[in-house]
Amino acid sequence: MSRGLGDVYKRQVTEDGPVRMADFYDGETYDATISLDKAAWRNAVQERLRVKPKLMADYGADVKEHETFTPVSCKKLGNALIYDFGQNFAGVVRLTVTGKRGQKITIRHSEVLNPDGTLNTAFLRTAKATATYICKEGRQTWSPRLTYMGFRYISVEGVREEDVQVTGVMLYSDIQQTGSFRCSNEMLNRLQENIVRSAKSNFMDIPTDCPQRDERMGWTGDIAVFAPTAVFNFDMNRFLDKWLLDVRAEQLPTGGLPNTVPVQGYGFPATMPKMAVAWWGDACVLVPWAQYMAQGDVGVLRRMYPTMKKYVNACRFWCGFGFGKHRYLWEMPGILGFGDWVAPDVPQMSQWQGRIKWTGTASLCNTSALLAKIADILGETQDAKHYRALSEKTADAYCSLLTDGNGKLMEEFQTAYVLPIYLNMFPTQQIREKAAANLAALAKRNDWCIGTGFPGTPYILFALCDNGQVDAAYHMLLNTKCPSWLYEVKAGATTIWERWDGLDENGVCPIGDDGTDKMISYNHYASGAVGDFLYRRVAGIEPTEAGYKTFRVKPILGGGLTSAFAKVRTPYGDASVQWETAADTFTVTVCVPVGTRCELTLPNGTSQIL
């Protein structure tokens, strides 16, 4: 910092300030008895850099204080006060206390409690997530400035309940919520709220995986599958544009992308060489495409096009070690990817990873097909032809080698059906519908419980609903058995969980030794990607041309729902749909912004242009 010495300013530094410790994961210690005016200062030494960094204006959306929460309960347990804010969120605690000089107050944070009512901090792993405040005399207010935590519960030690007031302050990037969804089912409304709250908790300058444990990193796989839901709910332009700059900067010369951007910790684990990683690296294609469809800005496609090409070419390389049609199957060892990550139908991490042949092959089919579309948009006709052919050959390899040729997987699991159905990999609609019927039968045998991991979860309801299995889709959406979206709601979740079985019906975490080292987060937005289905099929609104220049309203009725509403912000203004059913009557109200056109399709199949 600069200190004034008469008319002369010198750059001076000190280690004697009130912030005694500050760490991203471990928290902050602040001593209010220390004054900077009495600190020992010394002149700063100018560093001679070997590089010439380019200074740029801050590009992204600033992290700011937003919602605040007051505790819903406080219980004395031993020497600690246990507060429940009633809501899981990312942020800090604002402490107002009447204290004595030198009095030490310690605040610890957690998402869940142990059965005895104490904080469960085991799932934080190495993160201490602790804020410590040393009081000056009198009444004072403090909150950490150089860290943040993810939590619902806190323990406060070193002060009496009557002398302290605590407030939860939610922190996230300054993104505007521009979309909304609601319907006649209150559990679905709570699910939508949980999706939004989890997204906010993880939009912390970069799209993180979770806000509480010793990660909080820009995992590419999470935002890859969640981006379509994100752009329905928020204005994501500045936030994602900034992160995509990081993606471009982090791309390897070989074309692969780190698993976390910016690279930190798990960028490439020791078990994984620096290669293309299916679905995780796909973020460089899926995220810009979601932005483009929401806003119609071709600039994001143009900026990311070289990155996309290098990445898809890298995927083609890693997928090409076989002979014949096997040259288009992603047959790498499971340990070199994530496969069907956190699929609840198999218990071990190695089993999730072992499905990489199915998920990786579908990934290459999808990214090359999207890249062909993008090449057409950008006028790169030869590229479009090349990547379209690559996608078609990959789809053919999947269907020829992994299915019986008539819509049945040789090895059946939900994601293995979902991806080729949703991505139109089957050669005919008839075969696709047979595959959807097989998927529905598989889901029914599983009591309509979800069995998909990261790659399949965003698309399973579309795969069913759009291929003659509407009832099956609604059975899965509205199921309250574990694992399911609404089981979490029934269990009291206020955000989206990383693991479908994060808590049993007694409020106890059943996660055993599955190879993930206590990997359980209760604020992890990835499976909230179902929000895309809530907007596009339940409410029935989706763009048919980038930026909603033209869009479709086509509600798919089911599940006993009697009404739904959705609003989205388009470049032309707000577009919305409100529908209701009563007896034999269906009423729909559509708001069409000036300069756009809407195709409305009623449940009886009749259509008109608005």
Protein language model regions, located:
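Non-catalytic C-terminal accessory modules of carbohydrate-active enzymes
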Residues: 11-33, 54-67, 389, 393, ...
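Well-ordered alpha-helical segments within folded domains of soluble proteins
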Residues: 219-231, 237-242, 278-290, 357-372, ...
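Alpha-helical support elements that line or immediately flank enzyme active sites
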Residues: 92-111, 146, 157, 222-251, ...
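Extracellular polysaccharide-recognition and catalytic grooves
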Residues: 404, 408-512, 516-518
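Extracellular/oxidizing-compartment recognition motifs
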Residues: 1, 7-213, 221-222, 238-241, ...
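Solvent-exposed loop and edge beta-strand segments that line ligand/cofactor-binding
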Residues: 82-84, 144, 207-220, 268-281, ...
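Active-site acid/base region of carbohydrate-active enzymes
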Residues: 163-194, 198-201, 207-225, 229-260, ...
